[in-house]
C-alpha cells in the first residue's frame, strides 16, 4: 500500500515537472518578444496628446496637472494646491 502511494506521488511529480518544462518552452518565445512589444506600446502612448494629470499622477511642471492641482517638486506628483472653485 505504501509503495503504491509513493509510486503514484513520484509519477505525479514527474508529470508536473514535464508539464512545467513544456509550458516554459512554449512561453519562452513570447518572453523574448515582449520587450519589443512593450517598447512599441510606449511609443504609441508617448505620441498621443495627453489630458491633464489627475491626483497623484506623475508630472514635471504645474501645467501638467488638472485644475486645483499642483506638481509637488520633491516627488513629482500632482496634489491639491489649496485652491477652491469650479
Swiss-Prot record:
Disulfide bonds join 52-66, 59-71, 65-78. The modification Phenylalanine amide is found at residue 84. It holds the Pfam family Toxin_12. One of its GO terms (molecular function) is potassium channel regulator activity. Keywords: Amidation, Disulfide bond, Ion channel impairing toxin, Knottin, Potassium channel impairing toxin, Secreted, Signal, Toxin, Voltage-gated potassium channel impairing toxin, Voltage-gated sodium channel impairing toxin. SUPFAM superfamilies: omega toxin-like (SSF57059). The keyword ATP-binding does not apply. InterPro entries: Huwentoxin-1 (IPR011696). Residues 1-21 form the signal peptide. GO terms for cellular component: extracellular region. Residues 22-50 form a propeptide. It is found in: Secreted. Expressed by the venom gland. The keyword rRNA-binding does not apply. The presence of a 'disulfide through disulfide knot' structurally defines this protein as a knottin. This toxin acts as a voltage-dependent gating-modifier. It inhibits the sodium conductance (IC(50)=124 nM) and slows the fast inactivation (EC(50)=1180 nM) of Nav1.5/SCN5A. It significantly shifts the activation to more depolarized voltages and decreases the deactivation of Nav1.5 currents upon extreme depolarization, but only slightly affects voltage-dependence of steady-state inactivation. In addition, this toxin causes an approximately five-fold decrease in the rate of recovery from inactivation and an approximately 1.9-fold reduction in the closed-state inactivation rate. Negative results: does not show effect on Kv1.1/KCNA1, Kv1.2/KCNA2, Kv1.3/KCNA3, Kv1.4/KCNA4, Kv3.1/KCNC1 (all expressed in oocytes), voltage-gated sodium channels (Nav1) (from DRG neurons), and in a range of voltage-gated calcium channels (expressed in rat DRG neurons). In addition, does not show significant toxic symptoms when injected into mice and into cockroaches. Belongs to the neurotoxin 10 (Hwtx-1) family. 28 (Jztx-11) subfamily. This is Kappa-theraphotoxin-Cg1a 6.
